[in-house]
């Protein structure tokens, strides 16, 4: 068997799994509305200008076949795919939650970054599709916690030698950051907080326009 045939089978298998998962989501959540957000190729650019280390731990080598599979998944007409070159998928989901009124909005992702969207009241729940459970929504702002503690998945270090115990006291104004720590904290807040995207209103209009065509 040649390599081309194997690649074609891989693409077909990924597309089949993708379609099956979307159909399952619609059944499990009793809805015909599933919106899928994708990372734009240059979506993280402005964040990396603030924190160059942002997502520097993501290795894309050897994943060309996977990217081709995902490209074809995005082209499936029966799914509502949202992809904008200069925006990350997280930003797109935030915009979707701002744009959609009335309907109950449930974010389906294993990513804790979306806790902030529920905390802001823009979505009602966050469902982890891996554990198959709804995430408990903490009282403390996830933006503040991650800005101090960091986030290894995004290669963000946070404030040095500060952890969850410090955060609990910090939000009660029992402890404080020095000037150098404040600078680190504020940069992390800009990068982590989806509401801090300087282009969020531009994205909102793009999302609204696409929603009218669905």
Task: Identify the function of each model-found stretch.
Residues 1-39, 45-46:
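Non-catalytic, usually N-terminal nucleic-acid engagement modules in DNA/RNA processing proteins
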Residues 2, 45-50, 116-120:
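A short acidic (Asp/Glu
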Residues 5-8, 31, 56-213:
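Extended two-metal-dependent nuclease catalytic cores across DNA- and RNA-processing enzymes
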Residues 37-41, 109-112:
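A short beta-strand-to-loop transition that corresponds to the Sensor-1 phosphate-sensing loop
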């Amino acid at each position: 068997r040649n390599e081309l045939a194997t690649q074609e089978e891989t693409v077909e298998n990924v597309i089949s799994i993708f379609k099956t998962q979307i159909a399952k989501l619609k059944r499990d959540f009793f809805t015909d509305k599933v919106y899928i957000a994708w990372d734009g190729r240059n979506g993280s650019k402005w964040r990396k200008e603030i924190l160059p280390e942002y997502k520097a731990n993501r290795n894309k080598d050897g994943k060309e076949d996977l990217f081709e599979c995902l490209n074809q998944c995005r082209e499936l007409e029966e799914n509502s795919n949202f992809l904008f070159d200069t925006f990350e998928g997280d930003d797109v989901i935030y915009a979707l939650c701002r744009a959609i009124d009335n309907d109950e909005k449930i974010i389906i992702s294993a990513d804790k970054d979306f806790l902030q969207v529920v905390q802001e009241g823009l979505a009602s729940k966050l469902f982890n599709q891996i554990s198959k459970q709804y995430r408990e929504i903490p009282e403390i702002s996830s933006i503040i916690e991650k800005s101090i503690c960091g986030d290894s998945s995004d290669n963000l270090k946070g404030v040095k030698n500060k952890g969850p115990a410090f955060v609990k006291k910090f939000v009660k104004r029992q402890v404080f950051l020095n000037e150098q720590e404040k600078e680190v904290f504020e940069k992390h807040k800009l990068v982590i907080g989806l509401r801090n995207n300087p282009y969020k209103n531009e994205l909102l209009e793009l999302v609204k326009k696409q929603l009218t065509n669905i």
